[in-house]
Amino acid sequence: MKTRSSSDLTLGALLGDFRLLLTLFIGFRLLLLLAYQPVYTQGVERGVSAGGDLFYYYLLGGFSADGLLPFRDWWSEFPPIPHFLTVILYQATARAGYSGFAMLYGLLMLAFDLGNLILMRRMGRRLYGANTGMALAWIYALMIAPTVFIWWNFEPMVAFVLLLSLAALLGKRETRSALWAGVGALIKFTPALILGAVWRFRAPARALRYTAIVAAVFGSVYGLLFAQNATMTLPSLTAQFNKSSYQTVWALLDGNYRTGNFGTPQERLDPANANVLTGNPSVIPGIVRLGIAAAVGLFVFARARRFDDKGLVAFVTITLLIFFLQAQGWSPQWLVQIIPLVLLCFPTRDGVTAVVLLSAVTFAEYPFLWLRTGDIGGAMSGALVTPFVILVLARTTILVGLCVGLYRRLREEAVIRTED
């Protein structure tokens, strides 16, 4: 009779070994980088970064070679952290060209995504137990969307700060959570949406203090930027809202079949270009969309009955999805924020299926369908319009379905809220 050695590997031991998961997670992404190194040659971008925004970031970082800096000499549609980071990475890899820049950028995003994996396990363990936390980490590691966007843009950094703020809030470390939410708002505005959950799940005095910390972090940085050059700083707060609609049901109503890309890097030297409308004006004004979203949000706010940790995560998730649904545009990289939150809310086969379907629809639209236009910044026309419309409607249906599921989760049971 054979005896099993203590060194023999079993399925349970393998799947329960977090160090092994980290090794596979990092190793797969590094090997992908080695096999498909990012290059730009003869006017064509190739490698793992092809189809993303890194080459555009590289061109923006190139302004610094002439002494031109973001928020002083050129405007950005994002808060300050992303493009100041771009300048730092450009300067650090100036002699290595685009390949060096893209590889360093991707490695930094890999570090953030590694943090996302660790936070998924930690929060999953807190919400559902150790086994489910480990299972969620494995599922996240196998998701293709976060892997792709490591090499395409800075969305893993946004998701990391959002999850870090949420994890701190779950641990009742509210000051730390507020600080991270404030930092997150300096990357993208979405991490600040956690404020809605704070006001619903914490006493008013604590929520007010939390809000004040977020505002202080955000306001102190923007105060310095406005003092330096208000004209070049203002577009970071307004440009996204001044764009015409794109890749949403709102865009279909407006007859806009284009992406939401801004113009060439050189156009950012003139702040007037931040307000140039490149498509048809909105049939439904932005203020109306915001009003509808606010009404839906207030309805959920008033009807929520679940005040445990699972309810808190569900509330943050539905807030994020409502915001994305009301937005005039859709960006594929938002998957990086959506996927971990949905998995934390629905650690089931249905939850995994939902994020896989959402990812499939998103990538079928971009890059698959957009590449058929011959210009990823171009417009849908002819035979491409029908599949484009179908994909937009399918994605919207999935997001609405997730919101319905989250609302039901928030209505499941009445848990008495207690304050520490």
Give residue ranges: language-model regions:
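Membrane-lumen/periplasm interface segments of multi-pass, membrane-embedded glycan/lipid transferases
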Residues: 239-288
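Multi-pass membrane glycosyltransferase architecture that uses lipid-linked
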Residues: 2-246, 283-420
